[in-house]
Each structure stands twice: as structure tokens, then as C-alpha cells.
A protein has these predicted regions:
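Short, glycine-/small-residue-rich phosphate/pyrophosphate-handling segment
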Residues: 91-138
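Glycine-rich phosphate/pyrophosphate-binding loop and the adjoining helix
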Residues: 129-164
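Glycine-rich phosphate/diphosphate-binding loop of Rossmann-like nucleotide-binding domains
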Residues: 2-40
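Active-site-proximal loop->helix
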Residues: 21, 46-49, 76, 93-105
Length: 164
């Protein structure tokens, strides 16, 4: 199975990435995590992106806040799928990062999830890999089924609590 590359702009993004890591682990998807900055370590970020396919990666998740150029910088240097996680900061509640991540020029796509959307970034990568992996596909089907069962259980609990 291809692995997922996870790149965050700084260690302040780790709480968001932890959810991504937990989701990938639960789906038994291998991954690596790195800190590269589009502004402070552009050469390292570029080198990682350019060699990602040869190093066994199937997709790359990038998490960054504020100017959030990381996903775009990575996408400019690879043809692998890049998923951007705009991270909330104390300035503009992450809207600046969302706009920086989602507004890419034609020809250099970045799939963008919600602000702090680490779980959905992992699930999107899993869906990409599951196109050619039946076992992973089944784990995703099972995960969705479990989610539906949890909602129905809560529905019954609320009805019971309200005496309905």
C-alpha cells in the first residue's frame, strides 16, 4: 500500500495533525509526518514533494495556518494528490488560511478540507488509495456503517430521554 505524506508548517499544527494520524492508524494506512515551511524551508519542502512518488507516497496532506502557502508549494512540485488543511489561528479564525489553500491557479490543484479538518483529510486520502485497494475500501465502508449506527443509537437515546 502507498503511504501518506503529512507535512505541517509548524509544530503548532500538531493538534490538528494528531486527528489525521489517528484516523490513518485506525484504517491501517502507513504514513510519515514532517515539518516543512513554505517560507522558512522552501528547498526541503520542494525536495520532499519532488521525490514523494519515488519514496512510496500516494498522496500528501499539508496543514498550515495564516498565509498557508504550504499546500500550494507542495502541489507545485508533485503530480500526486495534495490535500490542504487550513488551520485556525488567532487571526481571522483560519479564514485567511482557508482562502490561501483553496484559491489555487488552474493546473495546480489542492483539494481543500474544512478549517482544522484533519479527519476528513485522512479520509479523502483513504478514498484515493481505496480506488485500487479492496480491503481498504471495505474498511471505509465499515467505518461509515459504524458512523450511521452511532447516529441511530443517539437518536434512540434522545427519544428515550425525552420520553417519546
Amino acid at each position: 500500500m502507498k503511504k501518506i505524506g503529512i507535512v505541517m508548517g509548524s509544530d503548532s499544527d500538531l493538534p490538528i495533525i494528531q486527528k489525521t494520524v489517528d484516523t490513518l492508524k485506525s484504517l491501517e494506512i502507513p504514513f510519515e509526518v514532517h515539518i516543512y515551511s513554505a517560507h522558512r524551508t522552501p528547498d526541503e519542502a520542494r525536495d520532499f514533494a519532488r521525490s514523494a512518488r519515488e519514496n512510496g507516497f500516494g498522496a500528501i496532506i499539508c496543514a498550515a495556518g495564516m498565509a498557508a502557502h504550504l499546500a500550494g508549494a507542495i502541489a507545485a512540485n508533485t503530480s500526486l494528490p495534495v490535500i490542504g488543511i487550513p488551520c485556525k489561528s488567532s487571526v481571522l479564525d483560519g479564514v485567511d488560511a482557508l482562502l490561501s489553500t483553496v484559491q489555487m491557479p488552474s493546473g495546480i490543484p489542492v483539494a481543500t478540507v474544512a478549517i482544522n479538518g484533519g479527519v476528513n483529510a485522512a479520509l479523502l486520502c483513504a478514498e484515493i488509495l481505496a480506488v485500487s485497494d479492496d480491503e481498504l475500501y471495505q474498511r471505509l465502508v465499515d467505518l461509515r456503517k459504524q458512523g450511521a449506527e452511532n447516529v441511530l443509537k443517539k437518536d434512540a437515546e434522545v427519544a428515550s430521554r425525552l420520553g417519546l
